[in-house]
Amino acid sequence: MNELEFHPHADRRTGSHTMEYQHLGVVPVVSAQANSTPLGGCTLSDGVIRAMGDAARFHVDMEQLWQAAGSFLAEATGSEDACPVTGAAAGMAIAVAACVAGTDGLRVQRLPDPGDQPNEIVLQKGHSISYGGAPLAQMIALGGGRAVEVGAVNETPRSHVASAVTRRTAALVYVTSRTHAVHRKGVPLDELVAIGREHGVPVIVDAAGEGGLRRWVASGADLVIYSGPKMLGAPTSGFICGRGDLVAACRAQYSGIARPMKVGKENLLGLLQAVREYTAVPEEQRAAEQLERMTKLAARLDKIPGLSARTAQDDSGRTIYRVLLTVDPAAAGRSAATLAEEMRAGIPSIYLRDFKLHLGQLEVDPRALSPDGEESVVRRLEELLLDHGGAPTGMEDAR
């Protein structure tokens, strides 16, 4: 098979990306599970790539660039200031460090030893997630904090959070993700913000994969953390935005624990261009285009034996539309879990969203999926399942 046929993002002129992966012995991937750090984040637009290339050709005063980028991101999010970082996990460590050490140079350089500073970080047990295997509590510890989990995974009364706030509390943490964090019967963000205000304790929000760049700052959170690749289409990067004094404290950590977490000029200009492109498209337009695209794909996949396909909105209510695949084990000759393994085993390795395996379901997420990637998904599913009856679904089905 020609590498240009199976790699959805190869350069059509040279195939250089695929060839480089092959030279390294690395199998190309089609990500139908969204922009995922283990799968290389996101693919970049031509505009983002150009911005990174331009940055690579010149020297710059990085202090000035960080400040200017912070002002740009603050305007985009409606916050007082912003601090670029290498990603959401780094953002959590830096945000905690800012709440523990502030801008005091000696305290900054002593971290992760907090000394006599308040360093307890209160979070609901259902929000104690991991960043690709690295526990959130570990990121808190990197910033000099100590995670204090309250409640149970499936229920956290407001009184438990309020009672956990003491003179040793440095911040409250809230994770927005409905895929990774448990929100059922938990304390909603508005109530957490109220608790923080009552006790004079800042609230840190991990909004890594969220769109709506102004929503979380407007919620009253003091610091909000975003990932660059997850929703924005940026290279490996992220940023913290929010209250001016706390963002200044985040920036102060560049001389401490954040030294290995700073964004270089190339990724930083790529991030800014990605934000420009993301905010240029109205959310309603993006959702409508996504729904139309997934509706056409669902119609094709629904004709494959053993599969029932329909469009489904993100369970959290976000305007993200996917194809929901329900696998009939008898008709398909395998379970949803086995089908997911077989999709990953080929070339290219195709990753479907598998958070609903316990229901016998898989999902196709469009956010990281190119048109060529869609064809790879359809082709592989046909190859695996047509032995159990039915006929191939041609391109005409998508028209």
Swiss-Prot record:
Activity regulation, free text: Activity is dependent on phosphate.
Entry's EC annotation: 1.-.-.-
Example of a GO biological process term: antibiotic biosynthetic process
Keywords: Antibiotic biosynthesis, Monooxygenase, Oxidoreductase, Pyridoxal phosphate
UniProt keyword Oxidoreductase present: yes
Catalytic reaction equation(s): (5'S,6'R)-C-glycyluridine + O2 = uridine-5'-carboxamide + CO2 + H2O
Secretion signal span: none
PTM annotation (N6-(pyridoxal phosphate)lysine): residues: 230
Residues that hold phosphate according to the record: 179, 318, 322, 353, 367
Pfam family of the protein (one): SelA
Quaternary structure (record): Homooctamer; tetramer of homodimers.
Full protein name: 5'-C-glycyluridine monooxygenase-decarboxylase
Gene (UniProt): cap15
